[in-house]
Amino acid sequence: MIKVTFLAEQKVKEYSGRVTGFDILQPDALREAIAFKVNGELYDLSREIESDTEIEVIQLSDEAGLDIIRHDAAHIMAQAVKELFPNTQITIGPTIQDGFYYDFATDRTFTTDDLAAIEKKMKEIIKSNHRFVREVWTRKQAIDFFSDIGERYKVDIVSSIPENENLTVYKQGNFVDLCRGPHSPSTGRVKAFKLMKVAGAYWRGDSKGPMLQRIYGTAWRNKDELNTYLKRLEEAEKRDHRKIAKDMDLFHIQEEAVGQIFWHEQGYTLYNVLESYIRKKLMNNGYFEVKTPILVSKELWEKSGHWDKFRENMFIIDESESKKLAIKPMNCPCHVQIFNSHIRSYRDLPIRMAEFGTCHRNESSGSLHGLMRVRGFTQDDAHIFCMEKQVNSETVKFCDLLKEVYSELGFNEISVKFSDRPDTRSGNDEVWDRAERALLEAVKEAGLSYELNPGEGAFYGPKLEFILKDAIGRNWQCGTLQVDFILPERLGAFYIGTDGHKHHPVMLHRAILGTFERFIGILIENYAGKFPVWLAPTQLAILTITNESDGYATEISNVLKEQGVRIKTDLTNEKISYKIRLHSSSKVPILWIIGKNEVTNKTVSVRNLGSEKQESFSLENATELLLKIINLN
């Protein structure tokens, strides 16, 4: 007898032999079911249960169900491509955020017409409602099969699997693909999809390997969800930070410094405003600021463990045959050196050490994307050295600070991913228990909802990832807090405890923005360049109608600059309509327009960004209102 526990209903049923999901689920449940979990592992509904188990039904409404449908769509796309272009070889086709892709080896360059034809063929395959059939094969069986049909990339994948290990393939109609699964019952479960674009990709991500063509697609539960997503993409394209940056003259990137930013006056002003804001928050919350070297000997990276784990992403300089230097990819080992420069007591803890640290990582050129993915960046980095019993209270304080910063920057929807102990880790279970409990209690105390990310903690401790939602519903993972038991020990950090003996501190790695570059990119897209006045690089533009107003405009400008207002005064001979268009396209939030009447009456005409309405204010009232708006933060 096999005993099956239905977790949702908390019911137990017994069956006389092996059963599948189709055998044990009621017809109503089967209509909604995509797959099921057996003792935590995802199974196809057709896969047999062989022993006592706990099951959980996965429906399309679940995230796991949607991910399976996207996986189905990837296989359907591969089948469609093979039917339309038989000489194409298939490689890999995983799911990604919001969709899927599949890489193809072909001499053909896929066009937009090809994508339309592939979509049409996919709809035919979906309408045919082919069953997804799972089969377990030996390694030899798979190599022989894929060799016979000329799929050399599949042979390459199978050849990398240990000889004694079985693998799974899935069949749909006449199409067979190597796959771990699971899949839904049939191709007809895919209800709404669209192919998005074609891009290049290297086989196994190796730039020395063959170039493939990657077709991206998206799939959703229904057409309404698909249309909502496509509209969001349209809006995201309008908000692309690279386009807006050009209009606002914020920054540029060029081939001579790939992955690094040339900040222009307006962009660097925005950068400095954000840095000053964060610095003030840190100082008000008990942090002190340090500055550490950019170029550090490999000896320190070897001691910290980063040389083995991170070397491929470092920029390395050979000073001599025996001495190598690395441009730092992170700040933490250098902060431990500052901690170690004094004898520390338990009375000194916690120590909150912050740095706007410039770091470099050798990211592949294909992964670089405007401000969102760069090689040279600055982190709002800080490390808290504390006793184990202080982890909870320090985490609560950090969560409160993070919520305050995000809210003031315009992000009020925050979620948290909690990553607990991985299988391979340092430290004993008792220490991990205490650290995980401290983080969870802190997140709850801070009033934040969290999602468990099982086994995804670092080898040195559990971590929290903070995700904010922007104005068009996209999620961005920015803030982090990681508990580290290992680095202080590796680098010899200690404090003198109440017992007079040496103890290693716990190190909390934490950031709110992540990197300034990426966060500024997020801000640009969130606000579509229309920043709140306190954050805008130029807060006010004074525009004159004729040169008769120049003296009055200059006088106002000088007074406001002394009060810290970031201001531009346009005294050019251009028409006022042109000046308004020019400064509006630069996203200046407030315009003051000055003509003969304003000079005579000591007034200004105020026009806000996005409005055609102009209102006349006395200079005194306009100034008071402007300063009030600026000083909201």
Swiss-Prot record:
Region annotated Catalytic, chain positions: 240-532
Keyword match Repeat: no
Subunit relationships: Homodimer.
Entry's cofactor comment: Binds 1 zinc ion per subunit.
Any single Gene Ontology cellular-component annotation: cytoplasm
Organism: Wolbachia pipientis subsp. Culex pipiens (strain wPip)
Domain TGS per the UniProt entry, residue ranges: 1-59
GO biological process annotation, one example: threonyl-tRNA aminoacylation
Role this protein plays: Catalyzes the attachment of threonine to tRNA(Thr) in a two-step reaction: L-threonine is first activated by ATP to form Thr-AMP and then transferred to the acceptor end of tRNA(Thr). Also edits incorrectly charged L-seryl-tRNA(Thr).
Localization annotation: Cytoplasm
The protein's Enzyme Commission number: 6.1.1.3
Protein name, UniProt field: Threonine--tRNA ligase
Family that this chain belongs to: Belongs to the class-II aminoacyl-tRNA synthetase family.
Alphabetical UniProt keywords: Aminoacyl-tRNA synthetase, ATP-binding, Cytoplasm, Ligase, Metal-binding, Nucleotide-binding, Protein biosynthesis, RNA-binding, tRNA-binding, Zinc
PROSITE patterns per record: AA_TRNA_LIGASE_II, TGS
Record: residues binding Zn(2+): 332, 383, 509
Cofactor requirement: Zn(2+)
GO molecular function: ATP binding; metal ion binding; threonine-tRNA ligase activity; tRNA binding
Transmembrane annotation, as ranges: none
Known catalytic reactions: tRNA(Thr) + L-threonine + ATP = L-threonyl-tRNA(Thr) + AMP + diphosphate + H(+)
Keyword Protein biosynthesis recorded: yes
